[in-house]
Design a protein with these regions (language model features):
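Phosphate-group recognition and catalysis centered on beta-loop-alpha active-site segments
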Residues: 2-317
Length: 317
């Protein structure tokens, strides 16, 4: 059994390197999951700026739409975990994001929860963090010497009909997509979703943008890993399995189907090392400050020295 395991590792390791580099991505690819979200409030300006500063390949974000049609970066279906919605709008904390206008969301504090939950990582400036419009995330992504990659998930897309077309329209307006629906620069844009239907919609409106089919445990149990790999081959460029489905025998099957493998969400040093040994092509991580140097992508940086350079905790409004 041990010999068989080593055989899988040998066959799978680095087999996705050429395909990754052909897309213009660094290898192994580091996706800053909701930004550098171990060290700063998730999906806020400071989290994404820090991810840029430590050298993540992609800024990962969950895209939802407000009641009045504004695209925002937010993970949860409701606002209660990561904002002060219960204080600002009493009785509405269980309402979905889509029940709020952008003007309402802009009033919320999106950082104080982090200080309360992780006092050892708290910083006073986090209390001024705000929810980001996708336009504001694009401002951050375009602020460096070269554009940062964006790895964008349609979150609960069944609740937001047409969100794929809305997203593509905004990205084209901001210069991330050509009129033909291709990334303007190689390696700067990926779409991802747990929804096969959403990925099919992206095939229609922006067929040339790489697409990743996200897989969770319930999907694998219900449909089977091989069935999902076959579906992913028809839907795009790769899979994003929950981390424990990145074992080398799973990774090898995906590679043999011509798919890249980007497991989520790996935050411990041993997880990152093991995933790399298993032959994955990249990882989603809250700890891009660890993954980037561990994968030999760039030298480690002193994060404490970066904070003064990262600017305001929220966009100017």
């Amino acid at each position: 059994v041990l010999a068989l395991g080593f055989g899988y590792v040998t066959l799978s390791r680095d087999s996705g390197a050429a395909a990754t580099r052909a897309l213009g991505w660094g290898f192994p690819t580091v996706m800053a999951h909701r930004g550098a979200s171990y060290l700063a409030p998730e999906e806020t300006a400071l989290s994404y700026r820090l991810a840029q500063a430590v050298g993540a390949d992609f800024l990962e974000a969950d895209i939802q739409r407000t009641q009045d049609g504004v695209l925002i970066a937010l993970h949860d279906d409701t606002l209660e975990r990561t904002t002060d919605v219960a204080r600002v709008f009493p009785g509405r904390q269980k309402q979905p994001v889509s029940a709020f206008t952008w003007e309402e969301l802009a009033q919320l504090d999106a950082g104080s929860w982090f200080n309360a939950t992780f006092p050892d990582r708290a910083r006073p400036e986090f209390a001024r963090a705000k929810i980001l419009r996708l336009d504001e995330l694009l401002d951050i992504a375009l602020s460096g010497p070269s554009p940062s990659g964006l790895y964008l998930e349609t979150k609960s897309p069944e609740r937001f009909p047409g969100i794929e077309a809305d997203l593509v329209k905004l990205l084209a307006r901001r210069g991330y997509l050509t009129d033909a629906g291709a990334p303007t620069r190689p390696g700067t844009l990926v779409f991802q979703s747990f929804s096969a239907e959403s990925l099919r919609n992206f095939q229609t409106v922006a067929a040339l943008v790489p697409r990743i089919y996200l897989l969770d445990e319930a999907m694998v149990r219900a449909q089977g890993y091989d069935t999902l790999v076959t579906a992913a081959k028809a839907l795009g460029s790769g899979i994003g399995p929950v981390g424990y489905y990145a074992y080398p025998w799973h990774t090898l099957r995906a590679h043999r189907a011509g798919l890249l493998v980007h497991p989520y969400t790996l935050n411990r040093r041993w997880q990152l090392r093991l995933a790399r040994w298993f032959g994955v092509d990249g990882v989603f991580t809250d700890r891009c400050e660890l993954a980037v140097p561990m994968f030999g992508r760039r030298a480690a940086v002193d994060v404490d020295s970066l904070w003064p350079q990262l600017g305001s905790p929220g966009p100017a409004r």
